[in-house]
Amino acid sequence: GDAAHAMVPFHGQGMNCAFEDCVALARQLDAHADLATAFAAFEAERKPDAAAIQRMALDNYLEMRDRVDDADYLLQRELELALQARHPGRFVPHYAMVTFMRIPYSLAMARTDIQRGILERATAGHATLDTLDWPAIDAEVHALLTPLEDVPG
């Protein structure tokens, strides 16, 4: 899976990505009698998600290599879990979106970028969750993130 998609294997999504490609290709072949049109539609549909999972896999490697013992990173992970509990379905951790939900990789990446920004802004200059401005954080979550549901395959 990962080899077929020319991505590093640090997100474990190669086979899943390949299965998603199969479903998308079958859908496009059913929708278009002309093979060139079907393949062009398939590429347009899947290329953004392939690029997204490639970036997320590399980001995951860099995170595991460089950040897992960083105090700022650990505080952000702690806040991530707290926000998941405070805003279920709205603040969904990156790993959960990619691994346990059927949403496009490109959507997971875009939401991860937004959520990472929330985490970084909220924890800047803090060493503990006790000193955070929870009303401001909750307001930002509601302003930037809509509720997320699984997308049917």
Where are the language model's segments positioned?
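Alpha-helix initiation and capping sites
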Residues: 1, 16-19, 36
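C-terminal helical "tail/cap" subdomain of flavin- and related membrane-associated enzymes
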Residues: 27-153
